[in-house]
Curated annotation (Swiss-Prot):
Family in the record: Belongs to the ATPase delta chain family.
Taxonomic superkingdom: Bacteria
Protein's recorded name: ATP synthase subunit delta
Subunit note: F-type ATPases have 2 components, F(1) - the catalytic core - and F(0) - the membrane proton channel. F(1) has five subunits: alpha(3), beta(3), gamma(1), delta(1), epsilon(1). F(0) has three main subunits: a(1), b(2) and c(10-14). The alpha and beta chains form an alternating ring which encloses part of the gamma chain. F(1) is attached to F(0) by a central stalk formed by the gamma and epsilon chains, while a peripheral stalk is formed by the delta and b chains.
Lineage: Bacteria, Bacillati, Bacillota, Clostridia, Thermoanaerobacterales
Signal sequence range: none
A GO term from the CC aspect: proton-transporting ATP synthase complex
Gene it is expressed from: atpH
Amino acid sequence: MIKGAVAARYAQALFDVARDNNRIAETENELRGFMRLLDESRDLQQVLYNPQVPVELKKEIVREAFGKELSGTTLNFLCLVLDRRREVYLKGIADHFIALANETRNIIEAEVTSALELSVVHKVNLMQVLSRMTGKELRIRYQVDPDIIGGLVVRLGDRIIDGSIKRQLERLKDSIRETKVG
């Protein structure tokens, strides 16, 4: 089974339990918090992702470190993932769970990259256009990347809209090469 499919199955199982218990938002917040701490802690990564560390020790560490912050459902789910030796799928599971939660709430996550910081007016206008385009509420994360030279790169879920000057120059270069060859 491919990596994405494994993560999707585990995420769907956790989502079903969270939905049945009316705890989708809480479970999502717990997963986001757990993953944020996991991303920030090299020590925790080295323990959880190391196949030489016994599963029981991993579970004990998770219970000790997160037992007070996580609900029983989320904590038990993480222990199940560890029991099944699926810890390498944790990020994918969290991402799939968040996507399922967003789909339920008619929300789409977007990432907008610009060469310069966008003004508040530009951000509001962009949000309105993207919301009309998708028919969904948006959660947009903005980032600045001077390498794109100008324009925007917008990621909406699985779709990427590359309106950057860098991409336009690449297309022009490819077009010139094809003309010379042909």
